[in-house]
A protein has these predicted regions:
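Soluble non-cytosolic domains of exported or imported proteins
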Residues: 108-116, 177-181, 185, 221-225
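Metalloprotease/metallohydrolase-associated module, dominated by Zn2+-dependent proteases
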Residues: 209-276
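N-terminal module-boundary/linker segments of secreted carbohydrate-active enzymes
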Residues: 2-79
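A structural motif
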Residues: 154-156, 195-210
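Auxiliary, metal-adjacent structural segments of Zn-dependent hydrolase domains
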Residues: 31, 47-49, 58-73, 77-165
Length: 276
């Protein structure tokens, strides 16, 4: 009796595991990347940039700005002291950067280095993504993080926020191994800005493209909701059309197989892609 019971239990477990593995296989067959362009060096510090110069503006107190960290879903407002910089780009595109000051030390040189890092990276984005955004906030709510930290866009704001991890109090995004990942996330956040504010994107045409791609996605994260799908898809399109030599041929083939209608949608927008 005991042997029969054990056999029955093992059979049920085996069936359940088979079902779970089947679901996992099916799910992984619906997207190209689990983590978008993670192993690809799509951007480097030497990638073309439209950045011209960085100018210190002033010290400024910032109030009622959202505080976010990787391991907490709590959304609190905060006030902090910052160094404000103005970055200038070709085609008369300016951006204001606010670098949060360290609480224990007012280190202007460190803040300037951070501002320069992200200002140059911003210049590597295609012009159509730079046109509408006006501000970048670089936060200092540091906690242990082995990834890229927390990046976000506030609803109906022409700005985005970076709370990336530090290594020995220096920006992790400055490391060669993480630079491209950070630049990819920057493109993703700027895609949120253009989708929610500009009226450039036709919601009906975008929904049609999604429907035609029949529940296939660029990345696993794109499946979260329509906003993340848009941001991930436009980043994949940039990689597929303008950085194809930086990604695997097999992944490029999957782009064309999984999201051809999304790619076509962006192709037909005739965006200003300079300096890519």
């Amino acid at each position: 009796k005991d042997a029969a019971f054990v056999t029955e239990v093992e059979s049920k477990i085996e069936k359940k595991l088979t079902k779970i593995n089947s679901k996992k296989k099916k799910a992984s067959g619906s997207f190209v990347y689990e983590f978008l362009l993670w192993d690809d060096k799509v951007f480097t510090k030497k990638s073309p940039t439209t950045f011209k110069k960085l100018t210190f503006n002033k010290e400024e107190n910032i109030s009622k700005v959202m505080k976010r960290v990787q391991r907490s879903s709590t959304k609190k407002k905060k006030t902090f002291k910052s160094f404000s910089f103005i970055a200038e780009y070709e085609n008369n595109i300016p951006i204001e950067l606010f670098i949060e000051q360290d609480k224990d030390k007012k280190d202007f040189e460190k803040a300037e280095q951070e501002a320069l890092l992200f200002a140059i990276m911003y210049g590597q984005m295609p012009n159509f993504l730079k046109t509408y955004n006006k501000k970048i906030y670089v936060h200092n709510d540091v906690e242990f993080d082995d990834g890229l930290g927390t990046w976000w866009v506030m609803y109906q704001k022409k700005e985005f926020h970076i709370n990336s991890p530090k290594i020995n109090k220096k920006q992790a995004c400055a490391k060669i191994g993480r630079y491209s990942n950070c630049a990819v996330v920057m493109a993703h956040e700027l895609a949120h800005v253009i989708q929610q504010l500009t009226g450039v994107i036709s919601p009906s045409k975008w929904k049609k493209a999604i429907k035609l791609d029949k529940k296939k996605y660029c990345s696993k994260y794109a499946k979260k909701n329509s906003r993340e799908d848009f941001a991930e898809s436009i980043t994949c399109w940039i990689a597929a059309r303008y950085k194809s030599d930086k990604i695997k041929k097999s992944d490029l083939a999957k782009f064309n197989e999984f999201i051809p209608n999304r790619l076509k949608f962006f192709d037909e927008m005739n965006f200003n892609m300079y300096p890519l």
